[in-house]
C-alpha cells in the first residue's frame, strides 16, 4: 500500500520533462519566444543559424525547447531534431500574408515525417500586436489545420514581445503531452 501511494505521490509531484521542437519560417519570432519564456524579457536577436536550446521551467514541468533556424537553406536540417520530440511548436508570423502558403507547405511536409507521428502540434499565431495580423481562425484556415484529423493540435494567438498567449500555449502542451504519456 505504501509503495503504491509513493508512486502516486511521485507521479503527481515529480518534475515532468518534455522535449519540444520549435520551428517556423525565418523571422516568425521563435528565438524571441524562447528567451521571453526563459528570461522573461525581450532580447535582441539575429537570424538563427543552427539552433538555440533552453530549459524552461513552468508549473513543475521542465520543457527542453529546441529553437531551430527557419531560413529556407537550413530547413532541411529540421529533421535532425525530430527524434524523441513530444511537442512541436510551429511559429507563424501572423502579419506575413505573402509567406503563409510557404509556412503551410513546410508544416505539412514536416508533419508527414514518421518520427513526428506522435508529437502534438501547437501553432503560435505570433505578432498579433501588428495592425494587419491575421487572427487565429484565419491562420487555421490558411495552414489547413482542420485537415489534420489524426493529430492533436491547437492554435494560440501570441505576441512574443509582450508574452501574451505564450503560457496559455505551454498549458495546452503540458496537458496534451501528459494525456498521451
From Swiss-Prot:
GO terms for cellular component: cytosol; early endosome; Golgi apparatus; trans-Golgi network. GTP binds at residues 24-31, 67-71, 126-129. The keyword Lipoprotein applies. The keyword Cytoplasm does not apply. It catalyses: GTP + H2O = GDP + phosphate + H(+). Its EC number is 3.6.5.2. PROSITE patterns: ARF. One of its GO terms (molecular function) is mRNA binding. Activated by AGD7 and AGD10. A lipid is attached at residue 2 (N-myristoyl glycine). It is an enzyme of class 3 (hydrolase). Pfam families: Arf. GTP-binding protein involved in protein trafficking; required for the sequence-specific vacuolar sorting route to the lytic vacuole, for the ER-to-Golgi transport and for the Golgi-derived transport to the plasma membrane. Involved in the recruitment of COPI and GDAP1 to membranes. Required for recycling of PIN auxin transporters (e.g. PIN1 and PIN2) in a fungal toxin brefeldin A (BFA)-dependent manner. Involved in various auxin-dependent developmental processes. Belongs to the small GTPase superfamily. Arf family. Interacts with AGD7 and GDAP1. GDP-locked form interacts with cytosolic tail of p24 proteins. Interacts with AGD5 at trans-Golgi network. Interacts with A.tumefaciens AK6b. This is ADP-ribosylation factor 1. The gene is ARF1.
Amino acid at each position: 500500500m505504501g509503495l503504491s501511494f509513493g508512486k502516486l505521490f511521485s507521479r503527481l509531484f515529480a518534475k515532468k520533462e518534455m522535449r519540444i521542437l520549435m520551428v517556423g519560417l525565418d523571422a516568425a519570432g521563435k528565438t524571441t519566444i524562447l528567451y521571453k519564456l526563459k528570461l522573461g524579457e525581450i532580447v535582441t536577436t539575429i537570424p538563427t543559424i543552427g539552433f538555440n536550446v533552453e530549459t524552461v521551467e513552468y508549473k513543475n514541468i521542465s520543457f527542453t525547447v529546441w529553437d531551430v533556424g527557419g531560413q529556407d537553406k537550413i530547413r532541411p536540417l529540421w529533421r535532425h531534431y525530430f527524434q524523441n520530440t513530444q511537442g512541436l511548436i510551429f511559429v507563424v508570423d501572423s502579419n506575413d500574408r505573402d509567406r503563409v502558403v510557404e509556412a503551410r507547405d513546410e508544416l505539412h511536409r514536416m508533419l508527414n515525417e514518421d518520427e513526428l507521428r506522435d508529437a502534438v502540434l501547437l501553432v503560435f499565431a505570433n505578432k498579433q500586436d501588428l495592425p494587419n495580423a491575421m487572427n487565429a481562425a484565419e491562420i487555421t484556415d490558411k495552414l489547413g489545420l482542420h485537415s489534420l484529423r489524426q493529430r492533436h493540435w491547437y492554435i494560440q494567438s501570441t505576441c512574443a514581445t509582450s508574452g501574451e498567449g505564450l503560457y496559455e500555449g505551454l498549458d495546452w502542451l503540458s496537458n496534451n503531452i501528459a494525456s498521451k504519456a
